A protein has these predicted regions:
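Short runs within selected transmembrane alpha-helices of multi-pass transporters and secretion channels
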Residues: 70, 74, 138-157, 164-172, ...
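Short alpha-helical transmembrane segments in multi-pass integral membrane proteins
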Residues: 1-23, 77-143, 189-247, 303-368, ...
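N-terminal transmembrane alpha-helices
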Residues: 8-39, 43-44, 57-72, 76, ...
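Helix-terminus/linker motif at the lipid-water interface of multi-pass membrane proteins
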Residues: 28, 32-50, 118-125, 181-194, ...
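Transmembrane helical elements of multi-pass membrane transporters/channels
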Residues: 18-37, 137, 171, 204-208, ...
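Small-residue hotspots at the loop-to-helix junctions and early N-terminal turns
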Residues: 46-57, 131, 135, 198, ...
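Alpha-helical transmembrane segments of multipass membrane proteins
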Residues: 35-39, 116, 150-154, 177-184, ...
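Small-residue-rich hydrophobic transmembrane alpha-helices
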Residues: 49-108, 112, 145-164, 264, ...
Length: 458
């Protein structure tokens, strides 16, 4: 390795990997938790698995919107830290917490209205008694999800990505243990089935939020941030600034997740077996998505760091490094799906019909890995430069205008069923990747020197 190559590795590739690996480990814990939930519920009954699929499809839309909203904090914090403005970063956390909690309450209100119309969403009648209590239990956890998300994006923004990793892993262990005890009924605990999975998830999310609050209040190295947090006044202009950075990302992730949510609802129109199959494969496909987003977060942090220093050459080089890293991740995910997919599917369910249909979806799922990894790469690079409005419009065209209608056409008029839904994902994600890349390089050409805001002051 010559000096130039070593410098490129140390300056661009290594930091993304160092930031992304702890996030990836934490996300791997999320994947394992999703696998455990699906496997335990699937072993309990196919109806319970179908009910979980429907509720998770609905809630994933809102959870990803909340996650996207919190993502608006990361580049703001990272940019301020890159300039040594720690007190202002603490103030930005304060505004971000307020915005994220208010946003969560609004989404919970929407979900509460949606609960009144569950029986009109075309789902199999036999799963509705299982859907209702699970829906309410998961809904109660969203405020704690918002609190955890905001605090985690703060620690990620100051390049302490391992903090969120450890808290997520603790939450996963608690959730898996709670699932086993409450789904099947162990010792004095009742056999709650799907509701037990919901209670376990709610409990784990509360504990995760409490741990993050305790860490940020107790660690000495956060003293400067706490001082800025406490001394900053709550100003409407600051809250609106956070919202302008966060809401477009929320809509982008919401529309992306919405394509999967609507597809999940359409899978329910095909029957309980198709819906259960869709849940199995979405859980399996989450392996790639969450890995890509882990390293995508590393790209955002590094891009925002260089953006705060007005170093556009390093912004470009960091993004190029991210492209190669995520392409490698996509190749690894595809090999896991191709060679290990059948083995993993058998772990989710013993229903022969679900297994048979799931096997037909392995290749369509592999097809969309390239588009998924690249749209995440360039979307996160744009996020790092705080040019977030374009993300919203790209998502609207790719997922709402193209993905969902094409999925319907392939699944129903063309008769491809759930396979058609998956093929549509490939089209939507590749289009999104192309448009995000075009917008990023447009920003690079313009340079935007002197036309940005790097934080919120209190």
């Amino acid at each position: 390795m010559n000096a130039t190559t070593a410098n490129t590795w140390n300056r661009y590739y290594r930091p993304i990997l160092q930031l992304g690996v702890p996030i990836a480990i934490g996300q791997l814990g999320v994947i394992i938790m999703g696998f455990a939930d699906t496997m335990m519920v699937g072993r309990f009954s196919t109806d319970a698995l179908a009910a979980a699929s429907f509720v998770n499809a609905v809630f994933n839309l809102f959870v990803y919107m909340m996650l996207g909203y919190s993502y608006g904090l990361t580049p703001l914090i990272s940019s301020l830290v890159g300039q040594g403005r720690r007190a202002e970063a603490g103030g930005t956390l304060k505004y971000g917490l307020i915005c994220n909690l208010v946003f969560a309450l609004l989404l919970m209100l929407i979900l509460g209205v949606g609960y009144c119309f569950i029986d009109r969403m075309g789902q199999p009648a036999e799963i509705l008694p299982l859907v209702r209590p699970y829906y309410l239990t998961i809904g109660a956890s969203l405020l704690f999800v918002a609190l955890f998300n905001a605090l985690r994006q703060f620690t990620d923004g100051i390049s302490e990505t391992s903090t969120g990793m450890w808290v997520i892993l603790v939450g996963n262990v608690l959730n898996i243990a709670g699932n086993f005890v409450l789904i099947y009924g162990v010792g004095p605990f009742p056999r709650l089935g799907l509701l037990g999975a919901g209670v376990s998830t709610l409990t784990a999310r509360i504990i995760m939020a409490v741990i993050m609050v305790a860490l940020l209040l107790g660690r000495k190295r956060y003293a400067a941030y706490r001082q800025g947090f406490c001394q900053s006044a709550v100003r409407t202009a600051s809250l609106l600034y956070i919202n302008r950075q966060s809401f477009p990302i929320s809509l982008q992730m919401g529309m992306e997740s919405g394509a999967f949510t609507v597809s999940g609802i359409m899978a329910g129109w095909l029957g309980a077996v198709d819906l259960a199959t869709y849940q199995v494969m979405i859980t399996l496909g989450g392996l790639g998505f969450l890995l890509y987003y882990s390293f995508g977060s590393g790209i955002t942090i590094r891009v925002a760091h260089f953006y705060g220093q007005n170093d556009w050459s390093s912004v470009r080089s960091t993004t190029r490094a991210g492209v190669f890293i995520l392409l490698g991740m996509a190749a690894i995910s595809s090999m896991i799906f191709y060679f290990g997919g059948e083995f993993i599917i058998h772990g989710f369910t013993s229903d022969p019909a679900v297994i048979s249909l799931s096997l037909t979806l392995i290749l369509p799922m592999i097809l969309y890995q390239l588009g998924d990894s690249m749209q995440i790469c360039f979307a996160n690079a744009l996020r790092g430069t705080s040019h977030v409005m374009a993300m919203m419009w790209v998502a609207f065209v790719s997922y709402v205008v193209v993905n969902i209608p094409v999925g319907y056409l392939l699944a129903f008029p063309c008769g491809l069923g759930v396979v058609g839904l998956y093929l549509a994902f490939s089209i939507g994600l590749i289009l999104a990747a192309s448009l995000f890349a075009w917008n990023f390089y447009k920003v690079m050409r313009i340079g935007c020197i002197g036309k940005r805001g790097n934080g919120v002051t209190g």
